[in-house]
Every structure is written in structure tokens, then in C-alpha cells.
Amino acid sequence: MTTNTVSRKVAWLRVVTLAIAAFIFNTTEFVPVGLLSDIARSFAMPTAQVGIMLTIYAWVVALMSLPFMLLTSQVERRKLLICLFVLFIASHVLSFLAWNFTVLVISRIGIAFAHAVFWSITASLAIRLAPPGKRAQALSLIATGTALAMVLGLPIGRIVGQYFGWRTTFFAIGIGALITLVCLIKLLPKLPSEHSGSLKSLPLLFRRPALMSIYLLTVVVVTAHYTAYSYIEPFVQTVAGLSANFATVLLLILGGAGIIGSVVFGKLGNQYASPLISIAIMLLVICLMLLLPAADSESHLAVLSIFWGIAIMVIGLGMQVKVLALAPDATDVAMALFSGIFNIGIGAGALVGNQVSLHWSMSTIGYVGAVPALAALVWSIIIFRRWPVSLEEQPQH
């Protein structure tokens, strides 16, 4: 059975299963954001110290994305996905059992290894498995899976953690991954590696100034976002003085707004990707500047979160579109680099938020995050003027 002869129904089932896998991988990366206070309590540690777990995870993904992608470039993709899921599930069992914080961090490193490879191959696999002429929709489904991790995965993970303990959240993610693995084994055909690129692709990509500029923009804007977002749960409870339940609601609003951002980008992204990204970054700057003033009431924080969620989703989707358009000849290498760079930003933001919370005041995380966000806004305007044509999305062939 090949990808060319299967029915459209089976082809879509394969893409949907990949989207569910994307949902699970993104949920586990972000779910600690909603569990920091609970994990800190169980290990009798300050919340800001537990937050270093976010930085370690993100930087392991950043460092290992490209090396692991190159090491596995010749491995048949179905077998590779199965191996990734086995590592992913085993690491979640270890998270569930973690008897101290060090063991929890080790388990998260195992998950990060699986994550590093998964995100470097997923976009190209979705395109290969999609029904004819439906490549853009397949990528959109993967993006939806990613968005739903913020909308449903993170808040549900937090609710489970609130009522049953954070260990149960990690165990439940492992069970979800096991079910997805069974579906992948049943649905996926053999998928020989193709168009994955190699080390030879790197000098070629590094000689593309427009692409390098997008990578730089990505790391700066993601650092800005995660400086505040990584600590939003303790911020709501300790700075704003609001309830743990409202922290859950706020995460739900932030994620739900991401779906609106996804719809907006889906409608306008093909024609207006560049101005949309700049407008979204400007919106991010405003939201970060207003984070502390908005902490005076639940309604103000809720409204701010809607605009924040829309902005970060448009930014994330826009960056992916730019990278894929600028590196159609080495998508796996380009996306592995993108995943790595995105995670450098996550780790840097979480680290900055950690240091600000420990040595200054958690109340200022919005103001501190707004500084790189403003730099990103200026840089986006410069590069979209410098490369107006080459940065637009190339048409699907």
C-alpha cells in the first residue's frame, strides 16, 4: 500500500493522526507552565527554580534538533516515529514516578530528545501523506493540533494536575501517546526518507540572508513571549492575587484566542503574511507592556489574553510559512533549524523570566519581555522592506 493508491479517507486519517501526535508533543512541552506551583510544592522548591525545567527542555530540543535529524536522515520514517513514541512514553512513565526533581528533569530530557526529531520530520510527512492537492490543508491540520495543545492540552493538563496531582497529568499524556502509537502503526505505510537534506544543505541555507533574518526574528520574538508566558500561572496567583481556578481559565482563554489567530492567518496569510506578522508583534509589545496594569482585575487580564493569544499564534504560523517558502529544497533541515531556534527562544525567555522572578520581581516580567518584543518589531519592519518578494509564500505546486 503506497501513499499514491490509498483512498482520500485513509490519507486524511493519517494526517489527522499526525495532528493528534503534534497535539500530544506540544501539550507535554507546555503543560509544565500550568503545573509549576504544584511541582514546586511537591519538591519543596521555589516556583521560579522549578521553571528552569522549561529552559532545560527547550535548550535540549534546540541543541539536538539538527544533529538528531541528520543522524536519522536515512531511517525509514514509520520505524523512526515508532521509536520516538516508545522513548516518549517511557520518559512520561519516569516523570510519573520521579522521586526527586533531578529525576523529573532527566525524564523531561528524554521527552525532549523525542521532540527534537519529531518536529523536524512532521511537516514534510504531513505533506507526503496528504491527499493530492491538499498539502496546505494538511499543514493547517498540524498547526491546528499545535494550537489545540495551547487551547485544550495545557488547561486540561492543569485541571488534571489541580485535582489529581501533576504526576497524573504526565501519566495521562503517556497513555494518550500509547493510543496514538497504536493508530500510527495501523495506519502508516513504509515511508522511505526523502528530501530530508543533509549537512550539505547547511551552507546553502546559511547563504540565504532572508532566511537567516527570519531565524533571528524568531528567536527574539519567542524570547519576548516566553519571558512572561512561562510564569503566567504564578504571576496570576502571587502578583495579581487571583485564584488558581482563574489561572486555569486564563490559560484556556490564551489558548482559545490562538484558534482565532489561526483562522485569521488562514484567511489572510497567503497574501499578507509580512504585514500580519509585524502587526502581531506590535500587539505582543502592547500586551506585555499592559500585563502588570491589567493585573488589577480578572476582566482586564482576560481581555489582554485574547489579544496576546491571537498575536503569538499569527507570529508562529507566519514564521513557519516564511521558512518553508525560503527553503523548499531542504524542508527537514530548515524546519529542524527552525524548531531548534524556536526552542532557544523558549529556553531564553523562561531563563530571563526565572532570573527576573528570583532577583528582581515577578511583577515586572511583562515589561522585561516587551524589550526584545520591541526590538523584534523594528527588525520585522526592516527585513520585510529589505526582502519584500522573496519572503512571500511560494505557491503550492
From Swiss-Prot:
Q: GO cellular-component terms in the record?
A: plasma membrane
Which PROSITE patterns does its entry note?
Answer: MFS
Against SUPFAM superfamilies, the record matches this protein to: MFS general substrate transporter
Q: How does it sit in the membrane?
A: Multi-pass membrane protein
InterPro entries given in the database record: MFS, MFS_dom, MFS_Efflux_Transporters, MFS_trans_sf, Sugar_effux_transptr_put
Where is the protein situated, by its record's location annotation? Cell inner membrane
Q: Extract the coiled-coil ranges from the record.
A: none
Ribosomal protein as a keyword of this entry, yes or no, is no
Keywords (A to Z) from UniProt: Cell inner membrane, Cell membrane, Membrane, Sugar transport, Transmembrane, Transmembrane helix, Transport
What parts of the sequence cross the membrane? 15-35, 50-70, 81-101, 103-123, 136-156, 169-189, 209-229, 246-266, 275-295, 301-321, 333-353, 364-384
State the Gene Ontology terms under molecular function: carbohydrate transmembrane transporter activity
Q: Name one Pfam family in it.
A: MFS_1
Q: PANTHER family given for it?
A: PURINE EFFLUX PUMP PBUE, SUGAR EFFLUX TRANSPORTER
**Task performed by this protein:** Involved in the efflux of sugars. The physiological role may be the reduction of the intracellular concentration of toxic sugars or sugar metabolites.
Family to which the UniProt record says this protein belongs: Belongs to the major facilitator superfamily. SotB (TC 2.A.1.2) family.
Q: What is this protein called?
A: Probable sugar efflux transporter
Source organism of this protein record: Citrobacter koseri (strain ATCC BAA-895 / CDC 4225-83 / SGSC4696)
